[in-house]
Every structure is written in C-alpha cells, then in structure tokens.
C-alpha cells in the first residue's frame, strides 16, 4: 500500500503555483473572495492563466471551467459518484463554494489553515473536515510537506448511498444533517490524530483511485462508507461544529436531542419531560440556552431533515410521508414543509 511519503512530491500544477506565489508574493496572504470583490477575483484568474500559458503552454489551464461556485462535474468524472484528490498546495487563497459534499483528511498539516467567512482554523495531522455545499472557504497549504486528501461526493450519491448511515438517530447524525441539509453555513471538524485505521483507509482510498482498477468506483464508495462508519462509531464526541450552538452544548441537551431523534414521530414536550424527569420549563430553558430555539422548532427541523430524503422517493405518497414523520394531517405537513423550504 502507498504511504503518505508517496503523496509528498509536487505535481506540475503545484510547481507552477509555488513559482506563482514567489513571483506575486501578495497572494501568499491576500484572501480573494468573489462575493466581496469580484474584480479582484477576475484579475487573479486572468493573472494565473497568463502565467500558466507562459510556463506550461502545452497544458490546459488547470482552472478552465471553474468559478466561485464549483459544480460537481468540475471534479467528478461522468458516470462516477466520488472523486479522490490531493488538495493543491501553494494555491492562492481563493474563497469558493461548491455544489458537492467534500470530506478532507489532513495527512500532514505543517501549519495548514482552513479559512471560512468567519475565521482561520489551524489544522492538525489527522483532522477531518466535512465541508457542505455552499460553504465559502479555502485552504492555506503553502508548504511542500502539507498533505490533505479530499473526498468529493455528489449530493445525490450521499443521499442514496451514505445517508442511511445517518439514520441511527444519534448526536452525530444530527450534526451531519444540520451541516449538509440545513442552513447552518458551517462545517464539522474532528481531531483524530491517533486513529491509524482512518489514516490507512484514506491511503487505501487514494491508492484505489490512482490505480483505477476494475470496479474501483464501487470499491471507493464502500471504503468511504467504512470511513464514515468508523468516524461515527469512534469519534462522535470529538465532532466540533464550526458555527452552531451544538458546539457549546451540554450533555443534558445532547441526551434530549438524541431522544428526539429516536422518537421524532411521537415525541411531545410533555413526553420528553416525563422521560427525563424534568419539568417542561426546565427543558425549554435547556433548549433556549443551547440553541436559542424552542422544542417545536427543533422538532420541526428534525422532521424536515428526514422529509428532504423521503420526498426524493417517488414511490412514497405524500400522506405516507406525513404519517412516517408523525403528522396526522397531510395538509398540515405540506404547510409546514413549504414554510420550512
């Protein structure tokens, strides 16, 4: 099996980018956000392309077809569901979002940073980041010894292949659902420095992608599924949500939230209070303290996150979905679903 040292050599694009930053050092630290200043973004792209054609005239410009919001097809080959990449080192700090789901594994950090709209987060060896669609972010990896491996997943693939893994009704399932399907505009990060199983899986996935053997796409899906399962089983308590209330939640809140995930069809405030021997007022205070939201709003979020998936199955009638989610009235479910969207 390949080792992390096999991933250290710079490729042609990284050599180009390293030279570019030497020639234009302002872009070593300047963050370019197309949403804030489109002219700066366009200027940098033109500058990169001009320098590329000078240095690599026989190669297609590596950002051809790119934009500030990257489509799934920019990276993922047609008829495939997952793409495995090595994050480009020496890339200028171009803020971007994307249509797909991205899972990053930090093999070697060497002072790498994850930059989003709010802050810069130092990364450590073994860190795992779940970047959802539409999150504005970039990575600062201006070091030849930095290695970050990217899993790029189509959203439809995550829905059909991976989402059933998250129906375990636990705290981490809630995190995944909020990040990917909610409006949190945040990411999840795990610090998993000592998990050799995850590291070996990442290297195995990368090797499978590079070798491109028969059925490699299906093998990669299975390996990524195993990766997510280990993450959920072994590192639930290490998940940090970048911007959400969940980051600062207490154990009482986690227990209440888990219970609601398990019993979302039938749970009421009075039943929740009885199950935990709290008064209804105590539960309301816990929810307000940790989320700023009430019981009904949280329950609606849980139900609507599940509704998003059920509505994609055309074989289930609307009244059936309403019943599965705990709504006795199909009309009321439709009203709630439309207002939530």
Q: Where do the PLM segments sit?
A:
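N-terminal regulatory/effector-sensing and dimerization cores
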Residues: 77-173
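Short, Lys/Arg-enriched, Trp-marked, Pro/Gly-tolerant hinge/linker segments that flank
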Residues: 189-192, 210-220, 229-262, 271, ...
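Terminal helix-turn-helix DNA-binding modules in bacterial transcription factors
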Residues: 257-262, 266, 270-271, 278, ...
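A hydrophobic/aromatic-rich effector-binding and dimerization subdomain
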Residues: 2-22, 27, 42, 49, ...
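Short, solvent-exposed positions on alpha-helices
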Residues: 101, 121, 214-222
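Short hydrophobic/aromatic patch on the recognition helix
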Residues: 126, 282-287, 332-333, 337
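Solvent-exposed, amphipathic alpha-helical segments
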Residues: 197-212, 252-263, 306, 310
């Amino acid at each position: 099996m390949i080792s992390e040292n096999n991933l250290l050599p710079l490729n042609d694009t990284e050599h180009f980018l390293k030279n570019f930053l030497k020639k234009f050092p302002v872009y070593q630290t300047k963050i370019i956000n197309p949403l804030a200043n489109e002219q700066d973004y366009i200027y940098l792209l033109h500058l990169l392309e001009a320098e590329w054609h000078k240095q690599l005239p026989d190669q297609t410009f590596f950002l051809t077809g790119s934009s500030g919001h990257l489509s799934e097809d920019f990276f993922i080959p047609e008829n495939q569901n997952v793409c495995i990449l090595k994050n480009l080192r020496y890339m200028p700090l171009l803020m971007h979002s994307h249509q797909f789901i991205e899972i990053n594994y930090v093999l070697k950090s060497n002072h790498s940073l994850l930059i989003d709209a709010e802050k810069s987060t130092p990364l450590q060896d073994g860190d795992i980041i779940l970047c959802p669609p539409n999150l504005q972010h970039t990575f600062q990896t201006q070091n030849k010894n930095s290695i970050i491996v990217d899993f790029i997943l189509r959203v439809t693939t995550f829905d059909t292949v991976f989402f059933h893994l998250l129906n375990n009704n636990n705290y981490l399932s809630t995190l995944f659902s909020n990040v990917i399907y909610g409006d949190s505009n945040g990411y999840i990060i795990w610090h998993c420095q000592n998990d050799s199983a995850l590291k070996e899986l990442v290297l195995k996935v990368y090797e499978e992608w590079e070798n491109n053997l028969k059925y490699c796409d299906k093998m990669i899906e299975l390996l990524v599924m195993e990766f997510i399962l280990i993450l959920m089983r072994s590192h639930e308590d290490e998940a940090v949500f970048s911007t959400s209330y969940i980051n600062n939640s207490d154990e009482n809140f986690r227990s209440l939230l888990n219970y609601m995930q398990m019993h979302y069809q039938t749970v009421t405030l009075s039943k929740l209070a009885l199950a935990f021997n709290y008064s209804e007022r105590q539960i309301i205070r816990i929810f307000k303290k940790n989320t700023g939201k009430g019981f009904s709003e949280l329950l609606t979020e849980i139900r609507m996150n599940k509704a998003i998936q059920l509505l994609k199955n055309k074989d289930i009638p609307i009244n059936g979905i309403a019943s599965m989610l705990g709504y006795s009235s199909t009309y009321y479910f439709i009203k709630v679903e439309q207002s939530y969207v």
